[in-house]
Amino acid sequence: MSGSIKRALLFLCPFVMGAPPCMAWDHEWTVVTVTRTGSWGVASDSVQPQAIAKAIQRCRAMAGPANDCGAQIMAAKGDWMVANLCGDHKIIASGSSLLDAEREALNREISLQLFYVPDLPTCKRVVTVDPTGAIVPSNQQYSNAREAGQ
């Protein structure tokens, strides 16, 4: 057998022998960006820079010409993401479950309040994104960091 045929067989063998199928989020980047005014953009793509560009473009379409779309982004693969707005302070967090993402956002909110903004306004959920990149209606609208910190 020639060397090229051997290499081809070695390359194809794992695919033929029953490698598990890829899930959509195994190779899709999901990006979230939020502005200080609450406008946001979400996009998914197999290439991270493309997902970033699409999310910023969608944010700008929502926000209008004067905005800070792209100033703060989060990119993840297969994670839940939540974006909260606390006055004009943005918090974007991710986690393997919705509860983990919400917990991470709450931890960031508490840290922000303890170390940088003692009079941090109550946070409001701006957008929730599931592991496939779909936007999910949120039933949690306001944070409870003030109660958790007491």
Feature annotation, model-predicted:
Residues 8-19:
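Bacterial N-terminal signal peptides
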Residues 22-150:
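Secreted/extracellular ectodomain signature
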Residues 1-7:
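Positively charged n-region of N-terminal signal peptides that target proteins for export
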